[in-house]
Swiss-Prot record:
Underlying gene: recO
Keyword Iron belongs to the record: no
Alphabetical keyword list: DNA damage, DNA recombination, DNA repair
Lineage, top ranks: Bacteria, Bacillati, Bacillota, Bacilli, Lactobacillales
InterPro entries: ARFGAP/RecO, DNA_rep/recomb_RecO_N, NA-bd_OB-fold, RecO, RecO_C
Function noted in UniProt: Involved in DNA repair and RecF pathway recombination.
Protein name (record): DNA repair protein RecO
Species this chain originates from: Streptococcus mutans serotype c (strain ATCC 700610 / UA159)
HAMAP family to which the protein is assigned, alphabetical: RecO
GO CC annotation terms, alphabetical: bacterial nucleoid
Xref: PANTHER family: DNA REPAIR PROTEIN RECO
Length: 251
């Protein structure tokens, strides 16, 4: 086992035996690992093994089995996220998506930084739905999916009223719509925004303003992408869908 001090984000915990817990932590320097916490209820670690806790951990890391938490310091809480059921649901989906995107024990500091920055912006009050869309689009490559939202796959022209073709995994301009009779028939603003999302750097993001009807169109198309290209069905995503449904019913 290696002893390391590293920043880490708690993804989730689950009961193990009577009073023990298994805790999944995404670390900045060693990827994701499962940690065993004995007698978790009365442990000094009890407050720091909750989901969405960010801290500097001292860890004993085992690449071929359970790892152990030695100590911690510098705990950060996403207070605004935890105080809002919608933000919490979307944040939980993000960490589930990051967990699914890479294997355990795989170093991926860029994904770690991207996840933390997304959660920080969400906690600061930026639109959690659009932040989630941006995250979903930018981590597609972690699932081995490369989609072109920039130019027509046939003539490579840009700035037109594009539609998306699942057949060609990219955009069709009006002159090439006929290449795919089953094209998506998208609002042209959807591929335009997805192209922006694909290359956006959060350091330059100060505000987000997207109309509700466009959010629905983005959500529908991104769901289709994840279904058709990845086949991913996360419980946390279903919870969001159910929550949004009941939110509409209650209006």
């Amino acid at each position: 086992m290696q002893t390391k001090e590293t920043r880490g984000l708690v993804l989730y915990n689950r009961p193990f035996r009577e009073d023990d817990k298994l805790v999944k932590i995404f670390t900045e320097t060693s990827g994701k690992h499962m940690f065993f916490v004995r007698h978790a209820t009365n442990s000094k670690l009890s407050s720091v093994i909750q989901p969405l806790i960010l801290a500097n951990f001292i860890l004993k890391i085992n690449n071929h089995g359970l790892s152990y938490i030695e100590d911690y310091k510098g705990v950060s809480l996403f207070k605004e996220i935890n105080a809002d059921i919608y933000k919490l649901a979307y944040a939980t989906y993000l960490v589930s998506l990051a967990d699914a995107a890479i294997s355990d024990a795989v170093y991926d500091a860029p994904l770690f930084a991207f996840l933390i920055k997304t959660l920080e912006l969400m906690d600061e009050g930026l639109d959690y739905e659009i932040l989630t869309n941006i995250f979903e689009i930018q981590i597609l490559d972690r699932f081995g999916v490369q989609l072109n939202f920039h130019d027509c796959v046939f003539c490579h022209r840009v700035g037109l009223a594009f539609d998306f073709s699942h057949r060609y995994s990219g955009l069709l301009c009006p002159e090439h719509y006929e290449k795919d009779l089953y094209r998506s028939h998208l609002d042209p603003n959807v591929p335009y925004l997805l192209n922006q999302f694909q290359t956006l750097h959060f350091d330059s993001l100060k505000t987000i303003s997207v109309k509700p009807d466009m959010k629905q169109k983005l959500r529908k198309f991104i769901d289709e992408v994840y279904e058709d290209y990845i086949g991913l069905r996360l419980k946390s995503k279903k919870f969001i869908d159910d929550l949004d449904h009941w939110g509409q019913v209650m209006k």
